[in-house]
């Protein structure tokens, strides 16, 4: 049985013209207007790319530093040894440890949003695949989460650095702020995301790379964005 849409959602959907491609700024303004839930909704982008991720040369997994931040408190955990544990804690890591932290994670402790590891810890982390893999939390060099420079990594992820990847159908789902952000700030973050994807275009991608871009608040309707206008946009961060 089809679930009946709430009056709130019906009113939000009515504001979106599905036959139209919205300019990037219009789309941000409409996202804010249709974010009518009783909490500060997350701004989400859903980007369909012309790739087939089953081929290794058509995959995207990388990071973006959102210039206006994520609007969220990011909990960072670090796996390291010796002095590196203190370095991570001093840099602001919420949790830091070595073998004992691995054991806690194995037992189900997942009280973090990002897991960073030093390269020497990776052989031991391999056994955490069952816990970390399904949540996309396994540290990786491509994701910027395997590094010896823990202070820089902790600070970047705390400040608004996000890891993202294309799913098996070639779609990138990623948050880029909060509905309470100004339209200009949301646009600055979306532009940074677009530029990051273009810089990391897989070598095996053929034909039209950008297919569709939709944005929405977490409880709002999808809003189609004019891809060419977004890519042509020269955004000056004041």
UniProtKB/Swiss-Prot annotation:
Pfam families: Ribosomal_L1. InterPro entries: Ribosom_uL1_bac-type, Ribosomal_uL1, Ribosomal_uL1-like, Ribosomal_uL1/biogenesis, Ribosomal_uL1_3-a/b-sand, Ribosomal_uL1_CS. GO terms for molecular function: rRNA binding; structural constituent of ribosome; tRNA binding. One of its GO terms (cellular component) is large ribosomal subunit. Keywords: Repressor, Ribonucleoprotein, Ribosomal protein, RNA-binding, rRNA-binding, Translation regulation, tRNA-binding. CDD domains: Ribosomal_L1 (cd00403). GO terms for biological process: regulation of translation; translation. PROSITE patterns: RIBOSOMAL_L1. Part of the 50S ribosomal subunit. Belongs to the universal ribosomal protein uL1 family. PANTHER family: 54S RIBOSOMAL PROTEIN L1, MITOCHONDRIAL, LARGE RIBOSOMAL SUBUNIT PROTEIN UL1M. Binds directly to 23S rRNA. The L1 stalk is quite mobile in the ribosome, and is involved in E site tRNA release. This is Large ribosomal subunit protein uL1. The lineage of its organism: Bacteria, Bacillati, Cyanobacteriota, Cyanophyceae, Synechococcales. The gene is rplA.
